[in-house]
Structures are given as structure tokens and as C-alpha cells.
């Protein structure tokens, strides 16, 4: 009887060790943006914490945000729509529009942080060519940062918004752990094609066609909030992605040898003049 109980205890301990090991492996994988398994991108899985339950910290002033009348990821920013200009020292500027109606928490969080100077002076601590560039951590280590509420907030995922090339997404360490870190997808069409061929995520034919045409990283679909899209500056994105990198201390060659610094983020409104986008602050 004692031997049986001891055997059972030993078996339980062995199982627990396996569970802990698996949990640690999953945690390590999800800490790296794009390594976690993607969810079904063909379904609308939008989920957001009720904002009334969260209070913006008093140190942040929320800017006026004007949303686009219609959510269209690849359309030009419309007149009066809120946009951001991200000036990267030595590289140039990138501009982004936002999807307030589909990702209100992520958009409000990002624009508030940007307008309060939170991102100014921060670095792109993680750069992987043909994948993405990541920033939003004041410590520059990939382990810091906070939301305007001082706590994590939920993912906001919908089938209309995909991790296409130029998409602005929230970085996380697992579902519903969004803070201040973000990444910009840089992968081009050939990389997207390889990703689709691997078949790691279920996508509709329309979604697949968008990846093949625009580029992006299919396996990220459903696991990360897409809350913005680049409207200008793809050449800057590619230049940053092509910078020389080194081991980040964890075995991943993703840390820029020379710091890539966000000099300034400016929140403004878009204007269309003769079909060309210009910024009016």
C-alpha cells in the first residue's frame, strides 16, 4: 500500500515537472513576438476590457482622437483623421493611421502615450529583418513599459485587421497582457508566401490574398492586436529592419549594434490635398 502510494506520488511529481516545463517553454515562446501559436484568423474574436473599469493615470492627458468613418486597413487616412508621425533619428519619418472603432483600447493607449512624450527617446530594442521592429519599452530591454491605466489590457482582434506589412501591433507576453510595447510588421510578400505555405494558421481566401499582395506575417494573425497601419515611410521601415544586429543576450540576433532611437512622436490630423496626404498639426 505504501509502495503504491509512493509510486503514485512519484508519478504525480513527474507529471507536474512536465507541466511546469511546458509552461516555461510556452512563456519563453510568447515573450518573443510572433513565436506563439496563432488563433483562427477567420473569426472575429474582438475582446476588450470595459474601459469604465479602468482609470487613466493622472500623469497622462488623453488627446482628442478622431476616428475614420470606416475601417479599411489599406485606405488612405481621411481628412481630419488622427495620425502619428514617428521621427527616427538618422532614418527619417514613418506615419500611421489608426483603427479606433475596432481597437479602442490600444489606440487610446498608444496615442495618449505618444502625445505625452512617452516614446520620445526610446529605442527599437528588437529588430529582425523580414519580420518586424519592436519598441515601446522605456528600459530598452523588452521587459518594461506600462499602459496609461497602469495595468495590462485585453487583446482586440478582428478579421478585418491583419498583421500585414506596415501594420502597427501591440506586443505582448501572452493573451491580454498589453502594455506599452508595440511592433511594426516589415515582412514582404515573399516572406508572407512562405508563411502561408507552412499552414500554421487558418485564413480565409481573401485574407491569404491580402498577405500575398501586401506582405506581412500570417502566423501572427489572431494573437496580437492590430491597431494601426503605416501610410508613409516604408523606405524608413526597411532601412531600420536592415540595420546591423547582434545577440540580445538570449541567443536571438535582434539587438541593433547602433541604437535606433525614436527622436519624436507627433500626434496630428491628416489632410488630403489633390490625393496626397499631408500633415496638419
What is the meaning of each model-derived region?
Residues 2, 27-30, 55:
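Position-driven detector of the extreme protein N-terminus
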Residues 17-37:
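Sec-dependent N-terminal signal peptides of Gram-positive bacterial secreted proteins and lipoproteins
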Residues 7-10, 27, 39-40, 45:
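Intrinsically disordered, low-complexity serine/threonine-rich segments
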Residues 35-281:
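Cyclophilin-like peptidyl-prolyl cis-trans isomerases
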Residues 5, 23-25, 50:
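Short stretches within intrinsically disordered, low-complexity N-terminal or propeptide regions
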Residues 1-15:
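Short, Lys/Arg-enriched N-terminal segments with co-localized hydrophobic residues
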